[in-house]
């Protein structure tokens, strides 16, 4: 590989980068993990600071960050963290679902102050899933935690979307892809 080409592979673990910055756009194309979340937050904060500096220099300039998301989901807590970061931005954030935006990736999508779905793109929301083994009391405790997470997810979707309660319950029963149309 010529030295002037940007390497796509991380030298440490041979994984593809999932976050790219192009102009005022961030592209998150990958699994929602703690590591990818940290990579995104670093790129997002750098871009946010850069745009805020432009705002200070240019009268009337209102910065905007466009976040393109293509992800089949991943870690629920990493998804919550991404949503929180976007919501707390000092710059307007437009989230755009590209391709598939599923599961925990939809939390990131909801973090935008403006949300769009690309042509031929789909969203998927569903019940949480978990794995566990252990003693009966541990299983009961895990079920209580899952019940709380489901209530919190419902509250989050109800606050951020116009999905009626009946439709939300239907969506939670079976995996259905949603499009802009």
Regions inferred by a protein language model and the residue ranges of each:
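Terminal-region recognition feature
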Residues: 1-181
């Amino acid at each position: 590989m010529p030295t002037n080409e940007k390497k796509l592979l991380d030298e440490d673990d041979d994984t593809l980068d999932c976050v790219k910055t192009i102009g005022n756009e961030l592209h998150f194309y990958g699994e929602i993990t703690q590591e990818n979340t940290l990579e995104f937050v670093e790129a997002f904060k750098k871009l946010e600071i850069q745009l805020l500096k432009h705002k200070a220099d240019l009268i009337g300039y209102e910065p905007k960050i466009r976040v393109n998301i293509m992800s089949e989901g991943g870690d629920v807590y990493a998804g919550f963290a991404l949503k929180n970061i976007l919501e707390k931005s000092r710059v307007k954030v437009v989230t755009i679902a590209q391709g598939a935006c599923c599961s925990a990736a939809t939390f990131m999508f909801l973090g935008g102050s403006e949300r769009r779905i690309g042509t031929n793109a789909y969203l998927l929301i569903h019940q949480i899933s978990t794995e566990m083994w252990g003693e009966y009391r541990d299983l009961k405790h895990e079920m209580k935690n899952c019940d709380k997470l489901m209530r919190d997810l419902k509250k989050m979707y109800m606050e951020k979307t116009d999905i009626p309660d009946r439709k939300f319950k239907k969506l939670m029963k079976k995996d259905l892809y949603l499009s802009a149309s």
